[in-house]
Amino acid sequence: MLPIHLNLTVAFFLALAGVLIYRSHLMSTLLCLEGMMLSLFILMALMITHFQVFSVSMIPLILLVFSACEAGVGLALLVKISTTHGNDYIQNLNLLQC
């Protein structure tokens, strides 16, 4: 395993640990999720170039598109919770149900 692969794997697991540790605030959780998605994107792009499998070269871009959609939905939820409740606690997500 190359050192860059090891670094990106450690970055992914640190972001995963951040999701588990900072799960009370929505903003912290969203930042950790973005870190996970970014490390996955870079790791997949490096793996494709390292193994020279160019038939699946669009998968990192698709992952990046889904990551942008996830960020947009997460920020919309953050704005909705912040305007209605004044804070970004995740336990307020249960109050948004119809």
UniProtKB/Swiss-Prot annotation:
The keyword Transmembrane helix applies. It catalyses: a ubiquinone + NADH + 5 H(+)(in) = a ubiquinol + NAD(+) + 4 H(+)(out). The gene is MT-ND4L. The chain crosses the membrane at residues 1-21, 29-49, 59-79. GO terms for molecular function: NADH dehydrogenase (ubiquinone) activity. Core subunit of respiratory chain NADH dehydrogenase (Complex I) which is composed of 45 different subunits. It is an enzyme of class 7 (translocase). Keywords: Electron transport, Membrane, Mitochondrion, Mitochondrion inner membrane, NAD, Respiratory chain, Translocase, Transmembrane, Transmembrane helix, Transport, Ubiquinone. This is NADH-ubiquinone oxidoreductase chain 4L. Its EC number is 7.1.1.2. It is found in: Mitochondrion inner membrane. Belongs to the complex I subunit 4L family. GO terms for cellular component: mitochondrial inner membrane; respiratory chain complex I. Gene3D superfamilies: 1.10.287.3510. GO terms for biological process: ATP synthesis coupled electron transport. Core subunit of the mitochondrial membrane respiratory chain NADH dehydrogenase (Complex I) which catalyzes electron transfer from NADH through the respiratory chain, using ubiquinone as an electron acceptor. Part of the enzyme membrane arm which is embedded in the lipid bilayer and involved in proton translocation. Its main location: mitochondrion. It comes from Phascogale tapoatafa. It holds the Pfam family Oxidored_q2. It is a multi-pass membrane protein.
